[in-house]
């Protein structure tokens, strides 16, 4: 789901993230926290653990700054 205005995408967090049972799929995404996650589900798990509003900055690995 794309946010209007800032271009950041909200991760789609389903049951698997709630159960902490993410698939072993390597489709990296870059979170707004600056971390690269192996897939969207793992970003969701981190989002739930930290209770932060982590969104998807871009598909693929985060760029080194």
Curated annotation (Swiss-Prot):
Report the subcellular localization. Secreted
Q: Where is this site: Reactive bond?
A: 24-25
Coiled coil regions in record:
none
Which SMART domains does this one have? KAZAL
The Gene Ontology CC terms held by the record are: extracellular region
What are the disulphide bonds in this sequence?
13-44, 22-41, 30-62
- Name one molecular function that GO assigns to this entry: serine-type endopeptidase inhibitor activity
All copies of the Kazal-like domain together span 7-64
Q: Does the keyword Cell membrane apply?
A: no
Q: Entry's Pfam families?
A: Kazal_1 (PF00050)
Keyword line: Disulfide bond, Protease inhibitor, Secreted, Serine protease inhibitor
The UniProt subunit note reads as follows:
Monomer.
The protein's job, in short, is:
Inhibits chymotrypsin.
Q: What protein name is recorded for this chain?
A: Chymotrypsin inhibitor
**Biological source species:** Cairina moschata (Muscovy duck)
């Amino acid at each position: 789901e794309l946010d209007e205005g800032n271009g950041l995408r909200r991760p789609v967090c389903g049951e698997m993230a709630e159960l902490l049972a993410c698939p072993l799929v390597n489709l990296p995404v870059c979170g707004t926290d600056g971390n690269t996650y192996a897939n969207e589900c793992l970003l969701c798990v981190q989002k739930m653990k930290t209770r932060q509003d982590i969104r998807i900055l871009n598909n693929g690995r985060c760029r080194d700054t």
